[in-house]
């Protein structure tokens, strides 16, 4: 959106704080229904951030796919669970939680060190090639495909990892 600087900055801070509050709600709320609604709020904030950065097609896809389908599916799955399955236990920290947090922390630091140690020299040539290709492409959807497979490759990979972890978590909760 073409907004004046202060309004754009205010909306950016507002949506960022909404993302933080919603993410904390997903993790910290004891009721899974409220966590699922908080996840929907986070996904809507991400969609609004896409609109703020003039990516209207990606924002619409975000709303349709993630909020409209996946979050509704999560809410239905949680609603079919029994109340006793997500009751609070007296044992808050187990050995499995410690191992899981150790593995996740190790993966996080290895990803951070890999990203920091990688030479990003070839990325400049890729963006220049994309600028040349964009002039030749007729369709807007082809331009979106080029951007999603080059400029936004890392965020899409991170989203796929997050969805995989959510799927594994949902399976483990359903099996208990």
UniProtKB/Swiss-Prot annotation:
Key word Chloroplast present: yes
Chief site of localization: plastid
EC class: translocase
CC per GO annotation: chloroplast thylakoid membrane
One function term, GO molecular function aspect: NADH dehydrogenase (ubiquinone) activity
EC number, UniProt record: 7.1.1.-
Pfam families: Oxidored_q3
Presence of keyword Transmembrane: yes
Localization, UniProt: Plastid, Chloroplast thylakoid membrane
Coiled coil ranges: none
Catalytically driven reaction(s): a plastoquinone + NADH + (n+1) H(+)(in) = a plastoquinol + NAD(+) + n H(+)(out); a plastoquinone + NADPH + (n+1) H(+)(in) = a plastoquinol + NADP(+) + n H(+)(out)
Transmembrane segments: 10-30, 32-52, 61-81, 92-112, 152-172
Membrane topology recorded in Swiss-Prot or TrEMBL: Multi-pass membrane protein
Task performed by this protein: NDH shuttles electrons from NAD(P)H:plastoquinone, via FMN and iron-sulfur (Fe-S) centers, to quinones in the photosynthetic chain and possibly in a chloroplast respiratory chain. The immediate electron acceptor for the enzyme in this species is believed to be plastoquinone. Couples the redox reaction to proton translocation, and thus conserves the redox energy in a proton gradient.
Protein name, UniProt field: NAD(P)H-quinone oxidoreductase subunit 6, chloroplastic
Organism: Nasturtium officinale (Watercress)
Designated gene of the protein: ndhG
């Amino acid at each position: 959106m073409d907004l004046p600087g202060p309004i754009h900055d205010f909306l950016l801070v507002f949506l960022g704080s909404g993302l933080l509050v919603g993410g904390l709600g997903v993790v910290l709320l004891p009721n899974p229904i409220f966590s699922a609604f908080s996840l929907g709020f986070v996904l809507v904030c991400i969609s609004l951030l896409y609109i703020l950065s003039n990516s209207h097609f990606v924002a619409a896809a975000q709303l349709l796919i993630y909020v409209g389908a996946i979050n509704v599916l999560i809410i239905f799955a949680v609603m079919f669970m029994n109340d006793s399955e997500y009751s609070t236990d007296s044992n808050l920290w187990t050995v499995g939680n410690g191992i899981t947090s150790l593995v996740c922390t190790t993966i996080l630091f290895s990803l951070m060190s890999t990203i920091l140690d990688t030479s990003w020299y070839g990325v400049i040539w890729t963006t220049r090639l994309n600028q040349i290709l964009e002039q030749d492409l007729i369709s807007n959807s082809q331009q979106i495909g080029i951007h999603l497979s080059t400029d936004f490759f890392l965020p899409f990979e991170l989203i796929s990892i997050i969805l995989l972890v959510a799927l594994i978590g949902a399976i483990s909760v359903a099996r208990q």
